[in-house]
Design a protein with these regions (language model features):
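NAD(P)-dependent Rossmann-like dehydrogenase/reductase catalytic/cofactor-binding core
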Residues: 2-31, 55, 202, 233, ...
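NAD(P)+-binding Rossmann beta1-loop-alpha1 motif at the extreme N-terminus of oxidoreductases
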Residues: 4-85
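Internal alpha-helical scaffold of NAD(P)-dependent oxidoreductase catalytic cores
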Residues: 55-57, 179-210, 221-252
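Hydrophobic/aromatic residues located in beta-strands of well-ordered beta-sheets
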Residues: 59, 112, 140-141, 162
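Rossmann-like NAD(P)-binding element
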Residues: 64-67, 82-139
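Hydrophobic packing residues within well-ordered alpha-helices of enzyme cores
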Residues: 72, 76, 130, 152-153
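Rossmann-fold dinucleotide-binding core
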Residues: 142-209, 213, 217-218
Length: 343
């Protein structure tokens, strides 16, 4: 087990993470981050709380929802079972405390992870309240998947230390986090955030600029859109689609991504040769750029298919089964030497 506050090596990437240079002293780096403020404790925020605690960091939480504490307890119970299988130990676990206001949570923090509900006005008001009281050398990261930094800061501060730290759900299990900023965002803040996330075992994609949905959600949306069309047009059931992904695409994608799949599958000249011979018409026939109409028949087919796959299991049972399978995949990736970009 790594020393307290250090990453468990389940997400080790065999030394292939890019050298972004030393973390600047303008913002607190991993060696100075012992206390994280988490604003919001939904699935994403609660997942981050679990991850930070497992890495030995102290976490102060703020969430005004009446059921926030009970909800977080449930998330932590589920997450901790998973994290223990990945090597987390109770004696290394950080301490959890609650703040009565967002301002109280951030004023003593070394890093801030905001995961409030995706409501723009709510987030804008939150940033207006915390930016003046957060220590000036502390990075403020948002988990948002739909808003830009410019959206969040419109009409208020143009602080250069607010960045996107967008995870994939659940954050305590899936290694990816996408880091991005606006035009005015400090490069030093991005580097500091990247270094911190790497120090807790994350695989970081630091984007050159923001785009809606970032990278992974764009890819996921394209696949989901095609899946919806296959169901809407009567070509496949939800069960068939999920089977095709779980037993076809997913095992291969756990080792190499779609770009390398195409490169390795091209007979001559790799992916460059493929595009030189590319028949645009045949590819267009496989792709839809917009979702299908959500007719009652479509909704019924999707709902019935997913209920069949649930097989009477509740979400907690399904989540535990998912986590067990993902753990084994991550362990297999490590055993096989899968690095940041694949084999």
């Amino acid at each position: 087990m790594p020393e307290k506050g250090k990453p468990m090596d389940i997400h080790d990437t065999n030394g292939t993470l890019p050298d972004r240079g030393p973390t600047t002293s303008a913002f607190r780096g991993p060696d100075r981050i012992r206390r994280v403020a988490c604003l919001g404790t939904g699935l994403i925020g609660g997942g981050f709380v679990a991850l930070f605690l497992a890495r030995g960091l102290d976490v102060i939480v703020w969430d005004p929802a009446p059921d926030a504490k009970d909800r977080l307890d449930q998330i932590l119970t589920t997450a901790w079972t998973t994290l223990e299988r990945l090597g987390a130990r109770a004696e290394d676990r950080g301490t959890l405390s609650w703040a009565s206001t967002a301002e109280e949570a951030v004023k003593t923090a070394d890093f801030v992870q905001e995961s409030a509900p995706e409501r723009l006005e709510l987030k804008r008001n939150l940033y207006a309240s915390i930016e003046l009281v957060t220590p000036p050398d502390v990075v403020i990261a948002t988990s948002t998947s739909g808003f830009s930094i410019a959206d969040l800061q419109a009409g208020g501060s143009q602080s250069t230390r607010v960045i996107v730290g967008h995870p994939f759900n659940p954050p305590y299990l899936i290694p990816l986090v996408e880091v991005a900023g606006a035009v005015h965002t400090s490069r030093e803040a991005l580097i500091a955030a990247e270094a911190f996330y790497q120090s807790i075992g994350k695989v970081v994609i630091r984007m050159d600029h923001e785009i809606p949905g970032f990278i992974a959600n764009h890819l996921q949306a394209a696949l989901e859109r095609e899946a919806m069309h296959l169901v809407a047009e009567g070509h496949a059931t939800p069960q068939q689609i999920d089977a095709a992904v779980v037993h076809g695409l997913a095992p291969r994608w756990s080792a190499i991504g779609p770009c390398m799949v195409r490169h390795m599958g091209s007979s001559a000249g790799g992916i460059g040769g493929y595009f030189e011979r590319f028949n645009l018409g045949s590819e267009r026939s496989l792709s839809h750029h917009t979702p299908p109409e959500f007719t009652p028949e479509f909704i019924k087919a999707m709902s019935e298919g997913c209920r069949t796959m649930e097989a009477g299991r509740d979400k907690a049972t399904l989540s535990a089964a998912r986590d067990r399978a993902v753990i084994e995949t991550l362990l297999a990736q490590r055993h096989a030497g899968v690095s940041r970009h694949g084999v």
